[in-house]
Design a protein with these regions (language model features):
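SH3/SH3-like beta-barrel fold
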Residues: 573-577
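Rossmann-like dinucleotide/flavin-binding elements
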Residues: 369-402, 440-452, 463-478, 483-540, ...
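Flanking helices and flexible, charged tails adjoining ferredoxin-like Fe-S electron-transfer domains
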Residues: 197, 361-370, 393, 405-406, ...
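Flavin-dependent oxidoreductase catalytic cores
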Residues: 1-378, 382, 386-390, 398, ...
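Local beta-strand N-terminus motif with an aromatic residue
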Residues: 51, 157, 240, 304, ...
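N-terminal glycine-rich dinucleotide-binding loop that anchors FAD/FMN and/or NAD(P) in oxidoreductases
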Residues: 329, 413-439, 478-481, 540-566
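Hydrophobic, well-ordered secondary-structure elements that form the walls
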Residues: 243, 274, 298, 310, ...
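Short beta-alpha connecting loops at secondary-structure transitions
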Residues: 254-260, 305, 411-417, 533-537, ...
């Protein structure tokens, strides 16, 4: 990658080590509403990896704004900002304090007070009506931004970023969807933003003043459009030092950081149009930019001056350094599975391919690494590949035995159904090759062979995976000879018998929807059956809930919701309504079961370290986390070949 992306850049009198930005996002790493030591370790790791600018998790500038339980509050967070800035400073990374107010798109669950909004417009998901802000509240917001900027200044940050993007009060003032006022703040919708910028600039004169601006709400009937955004970007650009162009609003918050179903670099043209009117103010491209080559192209073509690669740096904190050295970074597959954590359960930010994300050590390890030895990994799915890679990276001699003819396990086998995951297993395989892992394909291990390896002092990690589920029907009788053919989702790519198909999805994840759409695209008559009230119930967390329903609708897939499978019939399968108990026959010739598999126990040898689906069939995230944890356990302990105790004291199912 050319030095323009990974080389230094000047910004408002400051120098950043690269043009790559790590943008603000929900982490749930806080101690209540305060930045924690985990925040410090999280941001320090990206700075160490070469990030040019780090924008901290957006802090609410008013105590009445708490959009999620662990949302940082600017008031009283000076020590946290200071610790983050101090940790990033040795690497030259610029730290900007993210400041914002969620307005009517916040939550009253924790504050128990009315939400604030420009007008009485309900948030679409919660239907909660805000109070229409009076001049007193508007003045409080302006003062709140100034006071927060002063705190960031005193903490030693390099500047602030004001949120005028998705889920922000200032954007709500800009938009005709949410601003129906008839006073000066309605006639001049950017007035409050200008007042905030002026107050912040007056308070933090020496700092960088950046803004994150929504330039398309995807609601042209009344919302912000690219054309209207050009007007206020032209107006605001002379007042600020940096502009990050984003999209998404009241009815399209999912469009801000969408998953892999949306094309990468989707904001390219939008950013180009804003840069045309921004004058000399640098502009940042945001929007599923995960490939350094794409980022470089955006710079070369004049789309932007810097590029935000937030999810890509969650996946690989060393993205900048790897790119500068000509090495491929660990890919971000844009699954949104564990990095999008705006969730009332407060999951901590992480990454399916990098389980250390969000769990960076706050202190140097006090343990002494074990002397390098021999490791045998049985099974080359995601868990086995990650275990082999981690051990080999630490200098251990690693062998990897895989009974099939290819690496990647079920991900590789079902590649056409989950193509977004293939780059991750390909990268793991390439890293194993680079690190000298000795791979033996078409090699099955026996219990006796595993036992002999363990007795010789070799650490053995078993990642033998899972098998397809049995017949999903509770009917104990086998399917009638002339009835529907049952098959697993993984077998779909090997060919599906002729006729109508039922896709049974008891999980609500991405696989069931992908299978149904794939079969419908092949011209099959498909009915999607789920026990849930909606299609893909678990996809809300990734931002794909509405998208999944839309794809099924466009594909012509029928839906049978709130239903369990009740038994076989000669012409189809019986489905029972979960609420009424009513049974309905769905005629079909094939049932594709998208249930989790059954753990394999062929190598269930006492003392063997089992990881991945052979412990419990879960997702790629848990498989890779198991692989990393098991390998780290090996690296940190010195085995005693004369003892068997150490071989039985750890299992990934009880690891913390």
């Amino acid at each position: 990658v050319d030095a323009a992306l990974t080389g230094p850049v000047r910004l408002a009198g400051c120098s950043a080590p690269s043009r790559i930005v790590f943008g603000p996002h929900v982490t749930n790493l806080g101690d209540g509403r305060r930045f924690s030591r985990r925040h410090v370790a999280y941001y320090e790791r990206r700075a160490r990896g070469g990030a040019g600018i780090v924008v901290t998790e957006t802090a609410s500038i008013h105590p009445g704004d708490q959009p999620y339980e662990r949302a940082p509050l600017a008031e009283g967070n000076g020590a946290g900002w200071a610790a983050i800035a101090g940790a990033c400073r040795p690497y030259g990374t610029l730290v900007l304090a993210g400041l914002g107010h969620a307005g009517l798109e916040g939550s009253s669950a924790w504050t128990r007070s009315a939400l604030w909004g420009p007008s009485r417009v309900a948030e679409p998901a919660t239907r909660e009506l805000p109070m229409e802000m009076e001049l007193t509240e508007i003045a409080e917001v302006v003062e709140g931004f100034a006071r927060a900027a002063a705190g960031a200044r005193d903490a030693g940050t390099d500047g602030v970023e004001i949120d005028i993007g998705v889920r922000s009060l200032l954007r709500q003032f800009h938009s005709g969807l949410t601003n129906h006022r008839t006073d000066d703040y309605g006639r001049d919708r950017t007035r409050v933003t200008r007042e905030v910028i002026t107050a912040v600039r007056h308070t933090f004169r020496s700092g960088i003043l950046a803004v994150r601006v929504c330039c398309d709400e995807l609601a042209p009937w009344a919302g912000i459009t690219p054309e209207s955004a050009r007007g206020f970007v032209r107006e605001l650009a002379p007042l600020v030092d940096l502009i990050t162009v984003v999209r998404g609003g009241l009815y399209s918050s999912h469009a801000y950081r969408p998953d892999f179903h949306v094309a990468r670099n989707f904001n390219t043209e939008l950013c180009r149009r804003m840069r045309e009117v921004a004058g000399a103010t640098p502009v940042v491209l945001q929007g599923s930019v995960v490939d350094p080559a794409d980022a470089q192209r955006a710079l070369d073509e004049g789309v932007a001056d810097l590029v935000e690669m937030t999810r890509a740096q969650i996946a690989d904190p060393d993205l900048v350094r790897r790119s500068a050295a000509g090495r491929a970074p660990r890919p971000c597959v844009l699954c949104n599975q564990t990095c999008q954590v705006l969730d009332p359960r407060n999951p901590v930010v992480s990454c399916i391919g990098n389980p250390e994300a969000g769990a960076e050590p706050c202190e140097p390890s006090a343990g002494k690494p074990a002397a390098p030895g021999e490791v045998l990994v049985v099974g080359a799915g995601p868990a086995g590949l990650e275990a082999a890679r981690t051990a080999a990276e630490s200098g251990w001699s690693v062998r990897l035995a895989e009974r099939s003819s290819r690496l990647g396990g079920e991900v590789a086998r079902a590649g056409a159904l989950v193509p977004h995951l293939l780059p991750l297993v390909d990268w793991l395989g390439a890293e194993c090759a680079r690190l000298g892992v000795r791979v033996a394909l078409d090699t099955s291990m026996t219990r006796g062979e595993v036992t002999r390896e363990m007795r010789s002092g070799t650490w053995v990690l078993v990642a033998e995976g899972s098998d397809p589920s049995p017949d999903p029907s509770p009917d104990p009788s086998p399917p009638p000879a002339d009835g529907p053919h049952w098959m697993s989702a993984a077998a779909v790519l090997d060919g599906v018998p002729d006729g109508a198909v039922v896709t049974w999805d008891p999980v609500g994840g991405p696989l069931g929807v992908a299978v149904a759409c794939r079969l419908a695209a092949d011209g099959r008559d498909v009915t999607y059956v789920t026990p849930d009230d909606v299609v893909g119930s678990r996809l809300a967390a990734t931002g794909d809930l509405s998208g999944a329903g839309e794809r099924l609708q466009r594909a012509g897939v029928r839906r049978q919701l709130r239903s369990d499978l009740a038994g076989w019939d000669g012409t189809g399968i019986r489905c029972r309504d979960r609420y009424t108990g009513e049974t309905r026959l769905v005629r079909c010739d094939v049932v594709v079961d998208c249930s989790p598999g059954r753990s394999r126990h062929e190598l269930d040898v006492p003392g063997a370290n089992r990881i991945g689906d052979c412990v419990a069939p879960r997702t790629v995230a848990e498989a890779i986390r198991d692989g990393r944890a098991a390998a780290r356990h090996v690296l940190e302990r010195e085995p005693d070949p004369t003892s068997t105790i150490w071989r039985t004291t750890w299992d990934c199912s009880t690891a913390r």
